[in-house]
Amino acid sequence: MKIYRSDRFKKTYKRLPDKVKNSFQKQLRLFVENQKHPSLRAHEIVNTPYREFRVDLQYRVVFRPYEDGVMLLDIGPHDVIDTWSRRGG
């Protein structure tokens, strides 16, 4: 699976605390191995082509699946999902 990172994701990721970056790397490894791993709690964002997975209790990753992989779109506190759900499809 190919992992693409949007410019927005890259910019936001750089500003994260090291602890969150470490948690993200761990969760990304799980995601690549098994997108349905229970600790990811991955699911669709209602009425959008986007999905999310859990980094930790507070942080989430928004992504969009493609045939050859996924595009990581954003990472941030849980309310980042609200921004993407308002965007719709």
Predicted regions located by residue number:
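A short, surface-exposed loop/turn module that caps and links secondary-structure elements
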Residues: 29-54
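Residues at the C-termini of beta-strands that transition into short coil/loop
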Residues: 7, 46, 76
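Enriched for short, Lys/Arg-rich terminal
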Residues: 2-4, 55, 59-60, 64-89
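Non-catalytic, surface-exposed connector residues within folded enzymatic/regulatory domains
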Residues: 3, 22, 36-39, 75
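Arg/Lys-rich, positively charged N-terminal/basic patches that mediate binding to nucleic acids
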Residues: 1-27
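Conserved short hydrophobic interaction patches
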Residues: 27-30, 78
